[in-house]
Amino acid sequence: LTLFTLDIDPPDGLGPGAAHLPAWLSLDQQRWLVEQFRVWERGPVPIRAAKVRGHEMSVRTVCLGWHWQPYQYTRRATDVNGEEVPPFPDWMVRLGRRALADAGYTAEQVSAYTPDTALVNFYHRDARMGMHQDKDEISSAPVVSLSIGDACTFRFGNVENRSRPYTDLRLASGDLFVFGGPARLAFHGVTRVHPSTAPDGCGLDDGRINITLRMTGMTDDRSD
């Protein structure tokens, strides 16, 4: 747990463990990631809206490495079509480590970071994400979040409940957001997508793609 504690207070006032780096991805990088998304969304496990307590989410999700469904990770998408999700690519590990380095983590923390799953969410203009914690992972390693397309209002809260104190910030196309250490279990959500705010050349004309990299802490003998 202590390995991934970040003690610096970032200048944006989000508190220890959280960092927002605007325009971290270039337009070329964003466009390339959108091209990858077009491949991922087709399958072998196609993009879908997960159901939480019987209610379908407004965002649609496709996964790499491990398949996420509430409230577990499996290799096979037993809630979709029973197929195994694509492997987690090596370039995403390198991307995640570069994100941590740029967010202020130490060299030791960066080298120990080995994400093994990506949750890729697509938000249409009316989609939302309620306040929640990312706590289905065994590992306490940081979450790396990338935004592409339309900007959104991202609400980043506290670790105790969904209420105040929280901070609303705008995540634009190309932005990086990292949260770990004391902020790892902070409640967070998306209250609004801002239509027609995607920059020309990012590869996405409408909606928002959010890619989150995580370390599950899972092994194959602990999965379906």
Where in this protein do the model-derived segments appear?
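Non-heme Fe(II) oxygenase metal-center motifs and adjacent flexible, charged/small-residue loops
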Residues: 1-224
